[in-house]
Design a protein with these regions (language model features):
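Short S/T/G/P-rich N-terminal loop/turn motif that feeds into the first structured element of a domain
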Residues: 1-48, 52-197
Length: 197
C-alpha cells in the first residue's frame, strides 16, 4: 500500500468538500489502484486528506492524468495557502486498517530515528490493545524516508476516545508511546468523511 497525505489551510470548507465529492464521483472511477481516503477539517481550519493507493506507481499515474491536473488547479483556488504533500511507501496497518464507520479520527505527525520500533508497536500484541482500547477501530502508519510518520487512527466516537486516553497502559507500552510520540503533533477530525473504492 502507498499513502499520500495532503494538508493545507482552508476556510472555504463547503467548496473544498464539494470538490472532493466531485473527485469521488467523476475522477475516482478512472483512478487505477486508488483504494480510498480519510478526510476532514481541523478546528484551526486545516484540510487533511489521507489517500490510499495500491502502489506509488498507481498514485503517480493518477497525478499525471490531465483531468487530475485540472481538478487540482480548482482545488488550489479554494485553499488559503499552499498544500503540503507527503508520500509514503512504508505503510503498516493497525488491525485491518482504518474504518469508514469511525465517528472520530486522529492524525498524528511525528518523527522517529528507528521506524522499525514504531512499526513493532503497531503490530505486537494487538489483542491486548483491542481489549484495553475497544474504541479504536483501526489505523494506518505511514513512514517517510527520513523517519517522519503519519499515523491515522479511527475511533468509534470522540467521547470514547477521550475516555480511552485516560487509561494508563502497561509500563513497557508507555515507554514505547513516549518514544514514538515525543514532539508529535495531533490533528483531530471531529467530523471525518471517508471514500472507498
Amino acid at each position: 500500500m502507498f499513502i499520500q497525505m495532503i494538508q493545507g489551510p482552508c476556510t472555504r470548507q463547503d467548496e473544498a468538500r464539494q470538490l472532493l465529492d466531485e473527485w469521488r464521483r467523476d475522477l475516482a472511477p478512472g483512478a487505477t489502484g486508488w483504494l480510498g481516503g480519510t478526510n476532514g477539517f481541523t478546528d484551526d481550519g486545516q484540510l487533511i486528506g489521507v489517500v490510499r493507493f495500491e502502489s506509488r506507481e498507481a498514485a503517480m499515474a493518477n497525478s499525471n492524468r490531465p483531468e487530475q491536473g485540472e481538478w487540482a488547479a480548482k482545488m488550489a483556488e479554494v485553499m488559503d495557502g499552499p498544500m503540503e504533500f507527503h508520500d509514503c511507501d512504508d505503510v503498516t496497518l493497525l488491525f485491518d486498517g482504518g474504518s469508514d464507520d469511525a465517528g472520530f479520527v486522529q492524525i498524528i505527525r511525528g518523527r522517529v530515528d528507528d521506524p522499525s520500533r514504531l512499526k513493532a508497536m503497531m503490530t505486537t500484541d494487538t489483542t491486548q490493545l483491542h481489549e484495553m482500547r475497544p474504541e479504536i477501530l483501526g489505523g494506518t502508519l505511514a513512514i517517510e524516508a527520513d523517519g517522519s510518520f503519519i499515523e491515522t487512527v479511527a475511533f468509534t466516537n470522540e467521547a470514547d476516545a477521550r475516555k480511552g486516553e485516560q487509561i494508563e497502559p502497561p509500563e513497557d507500552v508507555r515507554r514505547e508511546l513516549d518514544y514514538a510520540m515525543q514532539g508529535a503533533t495531533y490533528y483531530d477530525l471531529h467530523r471525518p468523511w471517508f471514500e472507498s473504492a
